[in-house]
Each structure stands twice: as structure tokens, then as C-alpha cells.
Amino acid sequence: MSNASALIRSLLIYGLCLPLAVFLGYLLANPQDFTTITVVTVVFSVLIFPLLLRWHHAWLIATWNCTAMLFFLPGKPAVWIGLAAASFTICILQYALNRKMKFLHAPSVARPLLFLTAVILLTARATGGLGFKMLGGDTYGGRRYFVIIAAVMGYFAIINRRIPAKRVGLYVTLFFLGAATMLIADLPGRVSPSLNFLFVFFPVDNLAAFTNQNSVVAQASVMDRPGGLAMVGLGCFCAMLAHFGMRGVLDTRKPWRLGAFCFFVLAGLYSGYRSLLVVLLMTFALLFYLERLHHTRLILPVILGSMAVGGLALLFAARLPLTVQRSLAVLPYIQLDPVARMSAQVTSDWRVQMWHDVMPLIPQYLLVGKGYSFSGAEQAQLVKDSLGSTELAGDYHNGPLTVILPFGIFGSIAFIWLLVAGIRVVYHNYQFGDPAYHNINIFLFAYFVVKVIFFCTVFGSFATDLPMFLGLLGLSISVNGGVAKPVFVPQPKIVFNRFKLHPSAHRPVGA
């Protein structure tokens, strides 16, 4: 009987799979057709749905900073965007079926986040809609709205449940190491063409590398900046500090940690981004202070090591690779190659000029922001001007400007409210969280504060940094099961009993 059941089951499976495979093969003959994309998406979703029910929370956290993309969808959105939408939908359905499966309690973040989302949607409605050109619309700019909405859904999906205690370290490590996939964007032209299939799943930083593989004349560049190395260095830097803490990284009994830490820092500096050096130094200094290491005997080795590194930089900085010199251009009193110094100065002047041009626009968009939408005619008019096209896209390379110009004063108020509430949440989890997660909580607090300061003073982009801020907040809340609160230990109250005699009263008179 069992053999007959197995045979019937096999026949049913083959009867469903074979016609489906033939039908998909027929559709894939025209892969760009909308019907093909729709059918493939539906089939893929049905097949992966059982796995999503079990692992959607873990997958969302692991891919939050990953650059992998859903190549078969219009616009090729990132994998984390698709997982955010799927995970949020699953969480809503689970709560509708079981009221006990509530989201973790963090109303202090939910209120400003919902207010900010409402401001963004109303601004989009008032300035021409979302503008999905990739879906056949007449306007551009909808991709950034799409990313912002996905980040909001992803935040609520992350705080849907608490991370299991045994997997907290793994989830946090995967969260930060996902940024290392950015290195794949720099591989074209550096790896064998047989590995080009990777670039179907991951975005490419420079398409010219593909043309140069079969070209006799290649494009020469004075300074090639591999941006993926910056994300590798930053991701490993964050993962090590979150896992070991500053005290653990500087532990002399395990020197491999400090060696690996320095290696990843140098790898990041090889990317040529000055902003990375600023973030690393600020995070290192704040963590060193928060862990009270300046009150320990580590303070002297750190001071001597810093002086030694500074002295070597003053003497030999001009002999380092140009990209490393460009990263060090933010430091004063260092002799650098004129090429590296000029490259850094040109970008600084370019940004200052752009800020000077857009600052007069603030009163115009103070009440109602300009949004992200713009027409194809506007793009064609400014396509020859790199500065004009950057301003049109809202990429001002300045955090406050990327908030107040697109979304006005109300968007700025909502975002400031969100940042203040976020700092309060990570601070409470750092102060009153589970001692087992002390290294994670103290790093999340320090890193969040550093990113807020960096966003407001050095460099920032609202559409890019909002997912980062919400990811850090969601991770902190999910690790601690909400917002930690101080535990009040009841103190015994001493009450004098006036009817009870002192022990000396019971002694004999002659004693």
C-alpha cells in the first residue's frame, strides 16, 4: 500500500512540475516581457513561501546591508527590499491570526516614524506622485520613495520578534558583514570572465570594465578607488567591535584580534574615502571612552601607539598608495602627493559650490518640499551638467539638505524626532539591557551616535541613511526584546519597634 501511495505521489509531482517547467521554458524565450516577469515572480514566490514562513526574520537581518538584487524584477530592487515587504506581510497576517504575536513594544520610535512616513507620502502626492519610470511612468524619482517605504516596513518586520538568545551573536555579525558584498561591485575587470555570472545577482560599480575586457584601448585612471573595500573594512570593523568590544579587541592575550582589526582598517583606507577614516576614528574614540578604558592601564599603550602611527604617517605618508593618501587627506600637517591632495580638494570644492547653489532654495521648499519626482524633460535639460543633474536628483552630499529640501520643515521635524527617540532607545538598551549583550548594546549606541553626528555635520543622504538608522534601531530592539528599562530593587525599610527592649536590658545586674 505504501508503494502505491509513493507512486501516486510521484506521478502527481511529475504531473505538476513537468508542464510547469515546459511553460516556464516557453516564457523565458522572451525574458523581458511583462507576462514572463509576472509568472516567474509568482512561481518563485509560491516555491519560497514555506521557507519565508520559517526564516523570514533571519534572512531580513542577514541581507539588510547586502547588495544582492532581485534581477528578474523591474528596476532590479535589492533583496532586502523584497524580504522587507514579504516579512512585513507575513507579520501582519500572523498577528491577524494570532493576537499574541505582537510587535515588540517601542512606541517612542513608532510615533515619529509613522509621522515621517505620512509627511513623505503627502509630499509625494503633492509633487507629482511616486514617479516609477521603470514601470512606464512619465516621471523619475520613485525608486527613493520605494526604498524609504521598504525601510519602514523592514523596521517593523525586524521588531516583530526577539532574536533567540543563542543566535544573537550570529545575527549581529551577519547584519554588519552583509556590507562586504559591496566588494563584488569592484570585481569586473579584476577577475576571470567566467565569473561574470556573479554580476547578474550583484550590482556593478563601473560598466566600462566589461568593455575593456575585449578592447585594445583601455581607459586609464590616475587613481582607481575600490569603494567595495570601504564597505568591507567598515563591516568587519563593526562586526569585531560588536562581538568582542573594544576591550576584547585590545586584549593582549589574543593578539590575532588586534592584527585582524588593523588589517580591516587598512583595507578600508585603501578605498580612498576620507569619510571612512572619520567614522572609524569617531567610533574608536567614543567606544574607548564608554568602556572606561581611559581608566585602565591600556591608556598608555594606546597613546604611545597613536603617537607612533602619527609619526610614521608624517614621515612616510607620501610613499603610500594614492588611495590611502586620499583617505588621509582629512588629517592636517601631513605631506601628501599633490595628486591625492588635489583629488580630495576638488571634491570638497564641488560640494561647497553645490551647497552654495541650493541654499537659497530652502525658503521656497520650507513648507512643502520638492520631493524626489522630476520629469524626463528636466533630466534631459541638465544631463550634460553633472552638478545640475546631482541637484535635480536630490543628492546634495549633505544630510540636513537631503531632508529639508525634499520634505520641508515638517519632514525635518519628524526626522529629528526620530533620531532623538532612536538615541534614547539605544542608550536605554546600553544602560539597562541584558549584561550578556553588553558589547553589542554599547557598540550599537556608540555607532548610532557617531552616524547621527556624521550625517548632520560631514556627509549624509536621507534616502540612503534612513535604512541604516532603522536597521540599527530594529536590531537593538530585537536583541533586547524591546526598550530596556531600569530594574528597581526593593530596599528593606528599617522600622523602630518601641516596645522591644534593647539586648542590654536582659543582662544580669551584676554583669
Regions found by a protein language model. Give the residues of each.
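Long extracytoplasmic/lumenal interhelical loops at the membrane interface
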Residues: V339-H356, P360-F407, V426-F432
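Structural signal for the C-terminal ends of transmembrane alpha-helices
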Residues: V46-W55, T89-K102, A157-R167, A239-L250, ...
